[in-house]
Amino acid sequence: MNSGFFLSPPNYDSPAELKSLLETLGFAMQKKFGQNFLIDKKTRENLISFLTLDKGTRVWEVGPGLGAMTYLLLEKGVHLTAFEIDKGFISLLKKIFLENSKQNFTLIEGDVQKNWLPYLIEHGKPNVFFGNLPYNIASDLIASTVEAGVVFDTMLFTVQKEAAERITARPGNKNYTAFSVLCSLFYECKIVKTIPASAFWPQPNVESAAVLFKAKKEFAEYKNFKLFIKIVKALFSSRRKNIKNNLGSWMKSNGYGDKIDLVLERSGLSGNLRAESLALYDFLLLSDIIGHL
């Protein structure tokens, strides 16, 4: 391990050593933050291999925890900004990484969902957005970046496998949701690795998967981004109902009156279709038509 660090990093492959470290420092695992440590070194190295990292590449890491991935990233010479909410981990990360990595490592304390956009506005976008996301915030965080209209060149997130399947689902798939549509607007998304529960400590009750997001070279055109987001969510508001019922109800509640038949006629779509059968283009078309009413 690098002797230049203020506190030597622990053996990230050893649950016993990690547990001992936590107990020695008096840290309590905060279940509300969904902490699970990736103890399989080959998996950690494999995840890094999916990223194009050069010296000076700007990387954001979400939820570094004890710093297992942080250590590997800094070894690559990247300029790393880590977002961590747990006060105990913040204290430890400072002792391990901050003392002699001030030019390459920045630690942002607090809730990433509140901090990422203000930090981006002040410091600009990174090349890579990366993390082993706590299951309880994964979907919300990714959706918030899309809904803000912010597109990263590359994102790689390890999430609950179920969430990964929703992100990468295509029309007609049972896992296809509003979240799938939002992710497909700006990114080509694919599951690059399935990770068993045994690779983590403590073991979660579910499998995980790493999802690679690569920004599309060309984005689909849209006239009103905020309206598009609202309509996607409205169309999936009740999966058992067809698009005429879901969209018609939303239009009446949002000042568009009883014009659903006109919208469907202009779109060429059958009102009997359900949202899970619509492609990205169909959602964009419907939002453009409604935006011109």
From Swiss-Prot:
Briefly, what is this protein's role?
A: Specifically dimethylates two adjacent adenosines (A1518 and A1519) in the loop of a conserved hairpin near the 3'-end of 16S rRNA in the 30S particle. May play a critical role in biogenesis of 30S subunits.
Catalytic function, reaction form: adenosine(1518)/adenosine(1519) in 16S rRNA + 4 S-adenosyl-L-methionine = N(6)-dimethyladenosine(1518)/N(6)-dimethyladenosine(1519) in 16S rRNA + 4 S-adenosyl-L-homocysteine + 4 H(+)
Does the entry annotate any disulfide bonds, and if so which pairs? none
Species of origin reads Treponema denticola (strain ATCC 35405 / DSM 14222 / CIP 103919 / JCM 8153 / KCTC 15104)
Localization, UniProt: Cytoplasm
Keyword hit for rRNA processing? yes
Its EC number is: 2.1.1.182
The protein's name in its UniProt record: Ribosomal RNA small subunit methyltransferase A
One GO MF term = RNA binding
**Cell membrane: is it a keyword of this entry?**
no
